[in-house]
């Protein structure tokens, strides 16, 4: 679990730094009508992290359930690959975007809660928790935490793409 939490910290720091270094007039600007702004991406990440932490906590309160062997073979790294665009479920679709500092503070808080939960729970107990992923179905708690790392990596790449598009548009 320590290595998973360390990877979470690494990608979180990269993403947070990229967002903090973003020109404020680009932060909430969409590169195209049907594409998210950087603000929307960060809000989405915060919402996802909060939902996963809530699901893990509920799973801990419930009866222990192990995820099937075949499900454990699905690599969570697949989440970071951006060859396919997914529609975010409504509950994690960003709305009412706060300013940059507030979104980043909320995101840091959500990460701190997740990490605290993981440390208190431990990886052996997390393996007995089953949570429902909207696209992959039931995954265990360790896979859910690992998935967050790759989900954040996916959106870090998206933020870089958004910045490239917006900066190219601003030059013209």
List PLM regions with ranges.
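Acidic/histidine-rich alpha-helical segments that form the ligand environment
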Residues: 7, 75-126
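Hydrophobic packing residues in well-ordered alpha-helices of helical domains and bundles
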Residues: 8, 38, 103-107, 145-148
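Absolute protein N-terminus
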Residues: 1-4
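Short hydrophobic/aromatic segments of transmembrane alpha-helices and their interfaces
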Residues: 9-10, 24, 108, 127, ...
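Structural signal for well-ordered, non-membrane alpha-helices
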Residues: 12-20, 49-53, 57, 111-122, ...
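Short, contiguous alpha-helical
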Residues: 30-77, 126-172
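Long, hydrophobic N-terminal alpha-helical segment
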Residues: 8-15, 19-45
């Amino acid at each position: 679990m320590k290595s998973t939490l360390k990877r979470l910290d690494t990608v979180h720091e990269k993403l947070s730094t990229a967002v903090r270094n973003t020109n404020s007039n680009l932060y909430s600007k969409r590169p195209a009508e049907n594409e998210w702004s950087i603000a929307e991406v960060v809000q989405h990440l915060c919402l996802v992290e909060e939902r996963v932490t809530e699901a893990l906590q509920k799973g801990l309160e419930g009866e222990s359930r192990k995820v099937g062997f075949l499900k454990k073979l699905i690599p969570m790294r697949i989440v970071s690959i951006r060859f396919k665009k997914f529609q975010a479920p409504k509950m994690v679709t960003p709305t009412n975007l706060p300013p940059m500092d507030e979104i980043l503070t909320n995101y840091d808080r959500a990460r701190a809660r997740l990490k605290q939960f993981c440390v208190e729970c431990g990886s052996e107990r997390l393996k007995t928790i089953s949570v429902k992923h909207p696209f992959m179905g039931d995954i265990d708690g360790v896979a859910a935490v690992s998935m967050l790392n790759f989900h954040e990596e996916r959106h870090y790449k998206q933020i870089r793409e958004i910045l490239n598009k917006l900066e190219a548009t601003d030059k013209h």
